[in-house]
């Protein structure tokens, strides 16, 4: 048995003296493990870092065997990801999310989304929006998707600003007004009418993580006896710190450009 596929490194663990078991999310073969001979050595270490993209050749005598990987790097992102705190936490959390997928089942939509997310992870705010959308996609892929396309109460498709914490359906401003204290905010960047040129606030990001986090806990993590990864909280805190620092820097620059008159 053998196949070739594109993959993204999710994790690696030492096996024996010199080998390693590498976990990939592959484009057409899903989350898949394999043995890399010499994978524990210093020569292979830069390649086998979470977030890197590889071309993978997998071989095994039988399909159900662990098999071996021969890997070649196609996009080496790890160095840039490790250069910033939000990206370091983010790639760890993304790998933890991908591990929720059944092994060896194809999830091409999730693979493509993970690839796009990792390719645009430099800016903390943009990375946060990507990660929230990835969590939303994971809910859908695991069978617990939220319907944010129309109001759950009226069927209207405009002015959707809330989400029902029970059904996971969007709710319009008018229909949700009497119960707004019980509803979850729907961040602008998750609305069907969102324009990518529109801005966002720190609170929008926190609302997004609250929304996806609540449903991930209820439907996916708690039934497995799990909670959110520590990396998720670390990512959110790193993004907030960078946002706060950027605002402070902007205020300082404005003060320098417009000194008080004497």
Curated annotation (Swiss-Prot):
Pfam families: RecO_C, RecO_N
Presence of the UniProt keyword Nuclease in the record: no
SUPFAM superfamilies: ArfGap/RecO-like zinc finger (SSF57863), Nucleic acid-binding proteins (SSF50249)
Keywords: DNA damage, DNA recombination, DNA repair
GO BP field: DNA recombination; double-strand break repair
One GO CC term, this protein: bacterial nucleoid
Keyword Disulfide bond on entry: no
Segments traversing the membrane: none
Gene3D superfamilies attached to this UniProt entry: Nucleic acid-binding proteins, Recombination protein O, C-terminal domain
Function recorded in the entry: Involved in DNA repair and RecF pathway recombination.
Membership in a protein family: Belongs to the RecO family.
UniProt xrefs under HAMAP family: RecO (MF_00201)
Protein name as it appears in the record: DNA repair protein RecO
Originating organism: Nitrobacter winogradskyi (strain ATCC 25391 / DSM 10237 / CIP 104748 / NCIMB 11846 / Nb-255)
């Amino acid at each position: 048995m053998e196949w070739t596929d594109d993959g993204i490194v999710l994790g690696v663990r030492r096996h024996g003296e010199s080998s390693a078991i590498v976990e990939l999310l592959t484009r057409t073969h899903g989350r898949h493990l394999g043995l890399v001979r010499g994978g524990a050595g210093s020569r292979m270490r830069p390649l086998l870092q979470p977030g890197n993209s590889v071309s993978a050749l997998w071989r095994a005598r039988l399909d159900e065997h662990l098999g071996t990987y021969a890997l070649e790097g196609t996009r080496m992102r790890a160095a840039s990801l490790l250069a910033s705190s939000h990206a370091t936490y983010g790639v760890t959390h993304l790998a933890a999310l991908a591990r929720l997928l059944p092994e060896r089942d194809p999830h091409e939509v999730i693979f493509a989304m993970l690839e796009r997310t990792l390719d645009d992870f430099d800016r903390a705010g943009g990375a946060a929006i990507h990660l929230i959308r990835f969590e939303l996609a994971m809910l859908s892929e695991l069978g617990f998707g939220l319907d944010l396309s129309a109001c759950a109460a009226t069927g209207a498709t405009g002015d959707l600003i809330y989400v029902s914490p029970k059904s996971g359906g969007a709710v319009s401003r008018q229909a949700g007004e009497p119960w707004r204290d019980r509803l979850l905010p729907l961040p602008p960047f998750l609305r069907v009418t969102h324009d990518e040129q529109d801005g966002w606030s720190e609170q929008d990001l926190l609302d997004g993580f609250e929304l996806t986090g609540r449903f991930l806990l209820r439907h996916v993590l708690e039934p497995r006896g799990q909670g959110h990864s520590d990396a998720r909280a670390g990512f959110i805190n790193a993004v907030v710190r960078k946002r706060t620092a950027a605002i402070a820097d902007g205020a300082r620059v404005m003060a320098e450009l417009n000194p008080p008159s004497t």
